[in-house]
Amino acid sequence: MSLRRQPDFEQFLKVLLRSGKPDHLPFYEHYASPEFVAERTGTNIDKMGYSDPGYWDIYVDFWLGMGYDCIPMEIPLKCPLGEGHGAASEGSESLAMIRNWKDYENYPWPDESNPIEFEHFDTVAKLIPEGVKIVGGVCMGPYEWTSQLMGVMGMSYALIDEPGLVDAVFEKIGSLIHSTDKQLGTMDAIGALRQGDDLGFKTSTFLKPELLRQYVFPTYKKIVEEAHKNGKPFILHSCGNLAAVYDDIIDDCKVDAKHSFEDAIMPVGEFKKQYGKRITPLGGLDVDVICRATLDDLRAYTRKQIEACFYDGFWALGTGNSLTDYMPVENYIAVLEEGIKVTS
């Protein structure tokens, strides 16, 4: 079923900036797995790469066909990761690329003037119709890149044995991300900048708050400033229990909107009660509920979340994490249908 509606990014902007109740309930997701997109579109996009003909046409149509006002999009840094099964798994020690200063010096760092493949943003900019904007940024944030390049254990040991090396890796990654957002922020087709960077798990952050303040948040602050300098809001997607650092994220980094919520940590409705006057929550419907609930129960659950979060207009409907390859497409469509029906 097509959920196409007249796209209007200005309505999503009202949500992000908390500047007025939008005319419709916007939708937002940080990520959709290639398998989910393939199932929804009836294509083989899950077997395609960014540079394959038609890839971005399918990707853009996927979001527009579900009633989105924006195209969520991220491209990774040109920083090679260790090859092998599980190379993208956080903290895979056997695939760590930087264990010492020699590794750091020999690593093929990209030129800071061209740290990502910007041409993909140019391609999507030509595909989007009037009323639609890209919400874009770098795939993975400073914590995720550093923990993958060094390995979680390797980084942890280095914090004690070789803190200067940890400083250098975080500084380099931060500079590359900052350079990217400095350029993306000037693109007319981009309506907001975003960063995904999973900082924690169910009970706490991976790094102590003081280490996040030392290594991670300075980069957040710089890239948020780039967004604001260009009159654009900034979205942070970060999983985990971040209660110890929400004040840093909101007041120091000045992030405009937060995505990624889990009922077991803090339901999005509770987050809105505590922080909603200072930052906009996005999404938050529990992925497990979406995957397992009957359609009737799922529609009721969706209505409950809308009532809890959209009463003032400052929220966008979506999952608490992402569109996974194991999520039934029809269940997610039921969520969006309910969002359109309840708020039309």
Please tell me what each predicted stretch does.
Residues 1-37, 41-48, 52-58, 69-73, ...:
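Active-site loop segments of alpha/beta catalytic cores
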Residues 76-83:
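Conserved alpha-helical segments that form or flank metal/cofactor-binding pockets of metalloenzymes
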